Amino acid sequence: MNRSALDFRHFVDHLRRQGDLVDVHTEVDANLEIGAITRRVYERRAPAPLFHNIRDSLPGARVLGAPAGLRADRARAHSRLALHFGLPEHSGPRDIVAMLRAAMRAEPIAPRRLERGPVQENVWLGEQVDLTRFPVPLLHEQDGGRYFGTYGFHVVQTPDGSWDSWSVGRLMLVDRNTLAGPTIPTQHIGIIREQWRRLGKPTPWAMALGAPPAALAAAGMPLPEGVSEAGYVGALVGEPVEVVRTQTNGLWVPANTEIVLEGEISLDETALEGPMGEYHGYSFPIGKPQPLFHVHALSFRDQPILPICVAGTPPEENHTIWGTMISAQLLDVAQNAGLPVDMVWCSYEAATCWAVLSIDVQRLAALGTDAAAFAARVAETVFGSHAGHLVPKLILVGNDIDVTEIDQVVWALATRAHPLHDHFAFPQIRDFPMVPYLDAEDKARGSGGRLVINCLYPEQFAGQMRAATASFRHAYPTALRRRVEERWSDYGFGDA
């Protein structure tokens, strides 16, 4: 296994060796400048920036932007994401999804518990804790505050100790030892917090920032309730994640993490959190009261690196990490339910607001169904799952379409979906509350925003196709295509 999957420092060094990292030694300001540079990196698909010289910050502290952004080189577009799993830099979406699904079927490998780890090189306890000494960035001009946690994961455990949950979440700085952030009731952190609330106790909590990249990715995967991400990460990389115990509350966190915050989630205290530029690409103008997270201890490596995601228009990590992990989980859900689905992909360009399902048309024909009945079956299966709850729209295409290629998806959507017959709304299915097009009535009702779009011609339900596709792949004999590819440079096109 490539060590980059289990060691964030190794991951950063690997990016540098690949030419996919820029060491920024020019002084920068955590107040918007770091956010602006990182947003431009996403939008230009430039190398990840590692900021070494941050004004008025803890000496030696650094910030890494765009840790899973896409690259401009099409052949290596997903290399930063692939490196999270120790895969080669030319790996694509299908390679990554295949690896994630294989780990779902593998035996979990429990973490290895250590007495000490690199994250304990520096430990602040009690009154020593001062989060404001770190380069906590204001990422967007509209944000309601500075965000410490945008590319880290919460660590919580059920009161009976049976389930350790790692889940990606955001946290806004309130003061030197307090943060605020959402604990959505339907997500795992909310489920576990409610168990502690019923006991009348605050929730023991930690956050890992700059954790093993594979662990961060797994924490963004909607695994089933009760499944501990640490064991899944072990199965994913083929060896245990090394963990150490926190200083104050008995939780276990990855031993080589850059920064660990620990303390508790308040029973009932809240603070206004947000607004914040979000995964869907918008920043709505009003914040919300969210639970307080009290930090009782802070551990960090020498010269710690704080990774950040500057959320907004795609693609950024909410799409490359979260969207990819959802894709793998939805494929598993669909196939376990017997649906004729051979690939699922949350198009990054759709900001994790739709998933495209590739349908095996021969298997579809064997079902003897039609568009309406099939859409209803897909909706019940997918939207009813934990992963499917997060994605409000599904697009069904034949497997002649490569669902990982957005131009093919858009072509199918424009030319195969009938405006009257192929749009199926499911207003009774509950919604994910952060979907941006939901209005006040939808949110009050908790439903109304679910849609399945059928991009399968009626003939495809019988295993046929209405018309031939006029493309290089479909409109020419195989032997001729190969000859053209082999002679491409002879024609004067170089290696393009």
From Swiss-Prot:
The enzyme's E.C. designation: 4.1.1.93
Catalyzed reactions per annotation: pyrrole-2-carboxylate + H(+) = 1H-pyrrole + CO2; pyrrole-2-carboxylate + H2O = 1H-pyrrole + hydrogencarbonate
Sequence positions that bind prenylated FMN: 168, 170, 187-188, 229, 386
One Pfam family hit: UbiD
MF-aspect GO terms: 3-octaprenyl-4-hydroxybenzoate carboxy-lyase activity; metal ion binding
Keyword annotations: Aromatic hydrocarbons catabolism, Decarboxylase, Flavoprotein, FMN, Lyase, Manganese, Metal-binding, Potassium
Induction: Repressed by hudR.
Transmembrane segments: none
Activity regulation information from UniProt: Imidazole acts as a reversible inhibitor via the formation of an imidazole-prenyl-FMN adduct. Activity is light sensitive.
Enzyme class: lyase
Keyword Ribosomal protein: no
Protein origin, superkingdom: Bacteria
Record's keyword annotation contains Manganese: yes
Record InterPro entries: FDC-like, UbiD, UbiD-like_C, UbiD-like_N, UbiD_Rift_dom
Cofactor note: Binds 1 prenylated FMN per subunit. Binds 1 Mn(2+) per subunit. Can also use Mg(2+), with lower efficiency.
Cofactor(s) needed by this chain: prenylated FMN; Mn(2+); K(+)
UniProt-listed GO biological process terms: catabolic process; ubiquinone biosynthetic process
Gene3D superfamilies: 1.20.5.4570, UbiD C-terminal domain-like (3.40.1670.10)
PANTHER family with a match to the protein in the record: 3-OCTAPRENYL-4-HYDROXYBENZOATE CARBOXY-LYASE-RELATED (PTHR30108), FERULIC ACID DECARBOXYLASE 1 (PTHR30108:SF17)
Recorded family membership: Belongs to the UbiD family. UbiD-like/FDC subfamily.
Description of how the protein assembles with itself and partners: Homodimer.
Protein name: Pyrrole-2-carboxylic acid decarboxylase
Biological classification of the source: Bacteria, Pseudomonadati, Pseudomonadota, Gammaproteobacteria, Pseudomonadales
